[in-house]
Amino acid sequence: MDRLKSVSPNDNGVWLGSESCSLDEFRTMVERKATAADYPLADSIQRNVPIYDAAKIEKAANDCDSIARYMAEWHRIFLNGPGALVFRGMIRDAALIDAVGAALKEIIAEERLVTGGKGDHFAKAGANARVWNSHEKLCMRAPELYARYAANECVDLVSRSWLGPLYQITCQVNVVYPGGMAQVPHRDYHMGFQDEAQLRQYPATVHRLSAALTLQGGISHSDMSIESGPTKLLPYSQTYLAGYFAALRPEFRSYFEEHYVQLPLAKGDGLFFSPALFHAAGTNSTADVERFVNLLQIGSGYGRSIEIVDRARMTKHVYPTALTMQEEGRLTPRELELLVAATAEGYPFPCNLDIDSPLSGMAPPSQQDIMRQAMSERWPSGRLNEAIDAYQARRTSH
């Protein structure tokens, strides 16, 4: 039961809603200027985004004091600064990045023969090509290439600067063809995948926390002129607490389109930014350039429970008892909802995006969704078991 769908944003700011959004307040937060004094270790600041020379970072990698200063500066950028940074020349081995790109394009071609194309969370299908879970797929196809590509000093350091150690890397290829239109501006995973009714369920502290659980990034596999549509960014927008609501509102999207910045990127450059930063892939207005990025979504190692609990097993076992108790009036509707929340898996991620494509929505159904539907429609136990087993079967990468 979504008891907070209509909650008012009050109680000393514990609860947020679209009513919490103020474009004037937003402007005061994002219309700032990053300076060399703010980020003295940056080699330059372009369009409000600090730029770093990856070769310098690698040379300093064994100097603990220097690296600690770099990492502290990057953390401040993501926390309350511009929200994005660029590593120039993050992969300088042209043969390596070309070979990895060729392997990923082979995967695209093979998957297209099977699926006909992948969905996208924030753009129309057909405007681009996707490889979900390119991290694992590259590893399995070309382990030596993967080993050289994945062993990247800048990726490790910037990940630890925001998430600490024990981070988890996932990658998703995005190739945008000539004429491919821009995405709508958005925030990203986790809360960027939720609608307003869902966002209202979470206190403001969790709105802050969401961005601390993930770091977004991308490795450029092609030279990207502005005309090819590199990622549009709105510096400092990650600092706006009500931003997950604001990103859904037309006046904020209009403001984004009037004030975003883009940076040209060279093949081998790396871009990293807060998932709460308002951003969107740009329009590829070229006639012949395929914009090719391997996106990185790097997650905190803390995003897990302490114990392994077989919730599918529990759901199937308790369901016939719960159904009988429901029919006999021994469980109220509210008690049934509490039982579902205590028993079944409520979060549908991580998932296999090759199977649970965003063409069918921002998020696939969870175990709780299945259990709720089963209780509502009085499914026989066999049908519930089949649905849960099918759900579990989709929870594999291959």
Please report, for each region that a protein language model flagged, where it lies by residue.
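Short, conserved beta-strand element in jelly-roll/cupin
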Residues: 162, 196, 202-226, 236, ...
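Non-heme Fe(II)-dependent double-stranded beta-helix
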Residues: 20, 27-196
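Extracellular structured ligand-interaction cores
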Residues: 84, 168-170, 212-218, 228, ...
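Active-site environment of non-heme Fe oxygenases that use a 2-His-1-carboxylate facial triad
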Residues: 4, 59-66, 221-227, 231-232, ...
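C-terminal hydrophobic structural anchor segments
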Residues: 295, 302-381
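Fe(II)/2-oxoglutarate
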Residues: 1-80, 339-350, 358-398
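Catalytic core of Fe(II)/2-oxoglutarate
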Residues: 246-321
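Active-site-proximal segments of catalytic enzyme domains
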Residues: 185-188, 192-194, 232-252
